[in-house]
Swiss-Prot record:
CDD domains from the UniProt entry: DEP_DEPDC4, RhoGAP_BRCC3-like
Protein name, UniProt field: DEP domain-containing protein 7
Chain's gene name: DEPDC7
Membrane-traversing stretches: none
A Pfam cross-reference name: DEP
Family, as annotated: Belongs to the DEPDC7 family.
Annotated SUPFAM superfamilies: Winged helix' DNA-binding domain
PROSITE patterns: DEP (PS50186)
């Protein structure tokens, strides 16, 4: 922990603390980061590398949580913090055993534990033994204070690597740093702010002819996400069939099968029973199993309501951005659109999109003999994602393929939204008007003198550019150029003389 503290003092800065207070301040900050991660990131049973692991969280969600926490508490003042630097903070926490990556091997060798900002990378919090207890007693999950205490007392931890990391982060300390110890806001208020600002940011990126759909979305009461998803299958008489399918998937080192079995959780019991009872007698015929699973998943999603059936006007806006080659803006707009999904639909869509991306891989199981896997997946699942009558088939296909190609990124939360939400939450928390420092500024009020000066300067600059364009246009004949220059001199002689001289 000593390395973490020095790291924090040097680059993130807590100059408001005296020398005697520095250990307390640094301990508080790091404990706060760890506590926020432990309490806000979603921990549940997940699949990773064809195996199922308990109590895991997603790398991209960890970045989202810490990113929001750092900005909201203004540990670094108003400086912009890139998402990449938050990823490196997560790497530092992983290096110090706050959490660990799910063990993976690449070609039989242990993979270097590098933190990944991805919805496909999973991590779990570490445990440390109670030093006062005897051998054999159960380990407990570290509380933030236990982490700080254990890391401070550890003589094995070297601070050099962390100090180098903090130096490379290049974050200057705030002039008036402030450790926020005020009461936290309720989850309901936080979710309402997230929804309001998400919609506001979406309006900035996408041109909408009508605001009805967004206003209806804003009127809906946001649901507070549950920490763990309660399964309704436990008491089902068909739970055994689901268990058999999961056991089969776990026994096969096949990413395709793993992604497909994950999707079965959302299929009705009757379909799952049919799949289980229709399994081929030869267990090694994975081609028949994949054909069975793909057909069942395709049939189910072709007969249910599309997962992105909300905000149809936004679909058109995103598709238009893609047509115009504005991929980065389209990606952020898509991230905002998916942020408006409730947790259950968001998780279901994430699993389906992951399965689609895996199944569309040309090196995977051939879905149809004379068709490309990518086109088959698009055709089967397009209506399961978007069924918008106002969206042409070409734009629908473009949108679906874009989602498949960027399935690892579309569920991340944009950094711009993080900052805007954090500023507003901080204002609410401190009792200020949350709309005073709004994140979306469409115009700025200026006095008449500044307006007049700006108008004259802008007009003059544009006229000079026009004159320069006429003078340097090689496509104009000498006669045409002389005529245009004469007209310009007649209307704006002062600018003409300024450019050409007397």
């Amino acid at each position: 922990m000593r390395g973490l503290c020095e790291f924090y003092w040097q680059e993130f800065g807590i100059k408001g603390f005296s020398v005697a207070q520095k250990p307390f301040g640094a301990t508080y900050v790091w404990s706060s980061i760890i506590n926020t991660l432990q309490t806000q990131v979603e921990v549940k049973k997940r699949r990773h590398r064809l195996k199922r692991h308990n109590d895991c969280f997603v790398g991209s969600e960890a970045v989202d949580v810490i990113f929001s926490h750092l900005i909201q508490n203004k540990y670094f003042g108003d400086v912009d913090i890139p998402r990449a630097k938050v990823v490196r903070v997560c790497q530092a926490l992983m290096d110090y055993k706050v959490f660990e990556a799910i063990p993976t091997k690449v070609f039989g060798k242990d993979k270097k534990p590098t933190f990944e900002d991805s919805s496909c990378s999973l991590y779990r919090f570490t445990t440390i033994p109670n030093q006062d207890s005897q051998l054999g007693k159960e380990n407990k999950l570290c509380s933030p204070s236990r982490y700080a205490d254990a890391l401070f007392k550890s003589s094995d931890i070297k601070s050099a690597s962390l100090e180098d990391l903090w130096e490379n982060l290049s974050l200057k300390p705030a002039n008036s740093p402030h450790v926020n110890i005020s009461a936290t806001l309720s989850p309901q208020v936080i979710n309402e702010v997230w929804q309001e600002e998400t919609i506001g940011r979406l309006l900035q990126l996408v041109d909408l002819p009508l605001l009805d759909s967004l206003l209806k979305q804003q009127e809906a009461v946001p649901k507070v996400p549950q920490s763990k998803r309660q399964s309704d299958m436990v008491n089902s008489s068909n739970y055994l069939d689901r268990g058999i399918l999961k056991a089969y998937s776990d026994s096969q080192e096949d990413e395709w099968l793993s992604a497909a079995i994950d999707c079965l959780e959302y299929l009705p019991d009757q379909m799952v029973v049919e799949i289980s009872r229709s399994f081929p007698e030869q267990p090694d015929r994975t081609d028949l199993v994949k054909e069975l699973l793909f057909d069942a998943i395709g049939r189910y999603y072709s007969s249910r309501e599309p997962l992105l059936n909300h905000l149809s006007d936004v679909h058109n806006g995103i598709a238009e951005l893609l047509v115009n080659g504005k991929t980065e803006i389209a990606l952020e707009a898509t991230q905002l659109l998916l942020k408006l999904l409730d947790f259950q639909n968001r998780e279901e869509f994430r699993r389906l999109l992951y399965f689609m991306a895996v199944a569309a891989n040309p090196s995977e199981f051939k879905l149809q003999k004379e068709s490309d896997n990518r086109m088959v997946v698009k055709r089967i699942f397009s209506k399961a994602i978007v069924d918008n009558k106002n969206l042409s088939k070409g734009k629908t296909d473009l949108l679906v393929l874009f989602l498949m190609d960027h399935q690892k990124d579309v569920f991340k939360i944009p950094g711009t939204l993080h900052k805007i939400v954090s500023v507003k939450l901080m204002a609410i928390q401190n009792g200020r008007d949350p709309n005073r420092d709004a994140g979306y500024i469409y115009c700025q009020r200026i006095d008449q003198r500044d307006y007049s000066n700006n108008t004259q300067k802008t007009t003059k600059d544009e006229l000079l550019n026009l004159l320069k364009t006429i003078d340097e246009d090689s496509k104009l004949s000498a006669k045409e150029k002389k005529k245009l220059l004469g007209q310009f001199y007649k209307c704006h002689p002062d600018i003409f003389i300024e450019h050409f001289g007397d």
